[in-house]
């Protein structure tokens, strides 16, 4: 960006009647620093989403108020191995995001350093895959809980276990928010690594 300023003086350019060009130096870091700050903020949001998903699913439990002599009707996350996988993977994703915060801070302090960003983009891709797999598998079980499957004689349980289904659905939505944030983090890091200036 350049600016022209007419200044009367004794310089040769001023005597010749030509405008003097003055350039303002660009700030080091510039837009890359802004992207790094946004990266840090998005990581905090993804931590909240992943922890919320793991906690909501882990605390999902409902017991029906009636029972027989031999059976008590209960639904909890540990009744489904897919939900157990979901809780473990979302806890791992949240743990990774917490451990990635120092590298994100390094990217804010040194916006032109490519090493931390490259390391983060590789690990973000790994944990994006893990979060997507656990979210999608839990979503399929939640769908079956809501709708059942008549071909296999699986009945929908959400008519009886409404609170349980609401909690598990909320956990799946929260995990998909974390997946969306991971996608944004990867795209932002790729843009910063792809631009030279």
Swiss-Prot record:
GO terms for cellular component: plasma membrane. GO terms for biological process: cell wall organization. It comes from the Eukaryota. It is a multi-pass membrane protein. Residues 1-34, 106-117, 193-197 are cytoplasmic. The chain crosses the membrane at residues 35-55, 85-105, 118-138, 172-192. Residues 56-84, 139-171 are extracellular. Coiled coil: none annotated. Keywords: Cell membrane, Cell wall biogenesis/degradation, Membrane, Transmembrane, Transmembrane helix. It is found in: Cell membrane. Disulfide bonds: none annotated. It holds the Pfam family CASP_dom. InterPro entries: CASP/CASPL, CASP_dom, CASPL. Belongs to the Casparian strip membrane proteins (CASP) family. Regulates membrane-cell wall junctions and localized cell wall deposition. Required for establishment of the Casparian strip membrane domain (CSD) and the subsequent formation of Casparian strips, a cell wall modification of the root endodermis that determines an apoplastic barrier between the intraorganismal apoplasm and the extraorganismal apoplasm and prevents lateral diffusion. PANTHER family: CASP-LIKE PROTEIN, CASP-LIKE PROTEIN 1U1. Homodimer and heterodimers. This is Casparian strip membrane protein 5. It comes from Lotus japonicus (Lotus corniculatus var. japonicus).
